[in-house]
Amino acid sequence: IVRRYRTVDIMEENQLYVIIVSGRDDSCRDVTRKWLEDNYIPYDELHMRKTDDDRDDRIVKKEIFDAWIKDRYNVKFVLDDRNRVVEMWRSLGLKVLQVGEGDF
């Protein structure tokens, strides 16, 4: 049984360029790619924190955004679950769809 997420279908139907910014570090890159593949989540770019970088997700994701996304793309929306990261994205003026309870 193939399970697809409606949001993923909408992104594909509208030919959106999908950039994943993960809080996982590079040591998990292969496992993360496999998980994305197994869950039928297409993407165009995958950005992850450097191995052994244990800084707060807000800092890491903001740095990735500034370095790789901000001046290159017109971001339509962000999907995230962690409350404090959702707040960071919103503080940048981005529309955020919070995908789960994120008080962790």
List where the protein language model places each region.
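Short, acidic loop-to-helix structural element flanking the phosphoryl-transfer center
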Residues: I1-I19, D26-R33
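Amphipathic coiled-coil/heptad-repeat helices and related helical stalk/stem segments
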Residues: I1-R4, R58-K61, R82
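Anion (oxyanion) recognition and catalysis
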Residues: E12, E37, R90
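Short phosphate-binding/catalytic loops that engage adenosine nucleotides
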Residues: L16, I41, L94
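A structural signal for isolated positions on well-ordered beta-strands in alpha/beta enzyme cores
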Residues: Y17-I19, H47, F77
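Short His-Asn-centered micro-motif
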Residues: V21-R24, L79-D81
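Substrate-recognition "cap/lid" segment bordering the active-site pocket of phosphatases
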Residues: D26-N74
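Acidic, Mg2+-coordinating phosphoryl-transfer loop and its flanking beta/alpha structural elements
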Residues: F65, N74-F104
